[in-house]
């Protein structure tokens, strides 16, 4: 489905990479999206989960599809004034919540959703994702419990990016998160 792109990309984490997984391309094919999430759901069937929580934008479709396959409730968090919130839904105290993401590189974005879950009184069990691109020496701060695929793709701090040093490819930001110019430079 052409979701794997090569070039010079600014990731949501602020890191740079020569590879980008444009998961919106997968979402345009419901059968392929369902197939990817089936492999994730199969890894989670014995878990006690009450709610699947998808951070907007990337996690919404995957949370819905995972919840559908597991017979669970699906909700999403979204940004209000650049702060992740639970605007349209509620989590009951003690509900066991699983975060559904499209791609996890550093897990930092998922921390925002974990905070929302815990502030609502829920219990964050971990993350399920389509693509796990975390590094062994830099694991996600939240356990990744299931993924459809694990990819070992390079990513760099901006000041260590060899693509920037080479100066041949422009830096492209394809993600949904609006990043301030100064944040792009310091992350």
Task: Identify the function of each model-found stretch.
Residues 1-187:
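PRPP-associated nucleotide enzymes
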């Amino acid at each position: 489905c052409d979701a794997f792109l090569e070039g010079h990309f600014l990731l949501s984490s602020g890191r740079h990479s020569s590879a980008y997984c444009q998961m919106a391309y997968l979402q345009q094919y419901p059968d392929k999206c369902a197939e990817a999430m089936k492999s994730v759901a199969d890894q989670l069937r014995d878990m006690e989960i009450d709610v699947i929580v998808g951070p907007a934008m990337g996690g919404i479709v995957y949370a819905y599809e995972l919840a559908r396959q597991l017979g669970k409730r699906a909700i999403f968090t979204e940004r209000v004034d650049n702060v992740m919130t639970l605007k349209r839904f509620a989590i009951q105290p003690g509900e066991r919540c699983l975060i559904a993401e499209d791609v996890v590189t550093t897990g930092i974005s998922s921390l925002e959703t974990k905070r929302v879950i815990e502030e609502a009184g829920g219990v964050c069990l971990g993350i399920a994702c389509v693509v796990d691109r975390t590094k062994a020496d830099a694991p996600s701060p939240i356990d990744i419990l299931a993924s459809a695929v694990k990819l070992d793709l390079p990513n760099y701090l901006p000041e260590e990016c060899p693509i920037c040093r080479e100066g041949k490819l422009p830096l492209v930001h394809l993600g949904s998160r609006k990043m301030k110019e100064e944040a792009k430079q310091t992350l």
